[in-house]
Amino acid sequence: MKKLIVLALVVSVAVAGGWLWMKSGNPDALRHIVLEQCLVNQQQHRNPAPCAQVKPDAGYVVFKDRNGPLQYLLMPTYRINGTESPLLTEPQTPNFFWLAWQSRNFMSMKRGTEVPDSAIALTINSPTGRTQNHFHIHISCLRPDVREKLDANQGQISTQWLPFPGGLEGHEYLARRVTEAELVKRSPFMMLAQELPQAREHMGRFAMAMAQQSDGSFVLLATERNLLVLNRASAEELQDHQCDILN
């Protein structure tokens, strides 16, 4: 009985803490920046500011995040909240993960020298793991310890979604290997929804990440929200916005 009471308290604290964390600040700040500033400025003055790039025809912008020296965000030019949106599994929706990977050069331009692909990670958080309600993929540095674990387990990552050995940052992750050719043709969101039964109707429970491996392939990572173990499904935990991996 005592264990059940303690468990209930833990869940209550986790939920309350997550709710308060989500409510702090303006959750629509990024949406206002994209729709009311970047897009308007590009259309009226051919100037993407305050974004670094605006691609209206392709449906996305690239924006320099204030957190970290090299972190950028890729965001749509129209309303999509996040991983929970059914738009992400529709074939006409842009392949945002691939577009984000193609936008990684902004990190090198900002740094003034090349940022190796092996040092870069893309992440998107779940609704309980984010502070903003406009879809955004984080383009930033990979944590050095995560890079080491991905390298050490490269041979165990298959073309199916399987548990990553030992998890990452204290949380369970599923991993799947994809080639560049696969990634160009099909969005990771569609791969997760179509290949993982528990994700199909509950995409909003998941956060995702992507990094390149030494053989040129990519590893997709997905973690599912589990408040019992204080996992808000925030794949951004795999990134280091201070970029120690470059030191």
UniProtKB/Swiss-Prot annotation:
Presence of keyword 4Fe-4S: no
Main location: membrane
One of the record's GO cellular component terms: plasma membrane
Cell compartments where the protein resides: Cell inner membrane
Gene3D superfamilies linked: HIT family - CDH-like
Class of the enzyme per the UniProt entry, highest EC level: hydrolase
Family per record: Belongs to the Cdh family.
Name of protein: CDP-diacylglycerol pyrophosphatase
Top-level taxonomy: Bacteria, Pseudomonadati, Pseudomonadota, Gammaproteobacteria, Enterobacterales
Gene this chain is encoded by: cdh
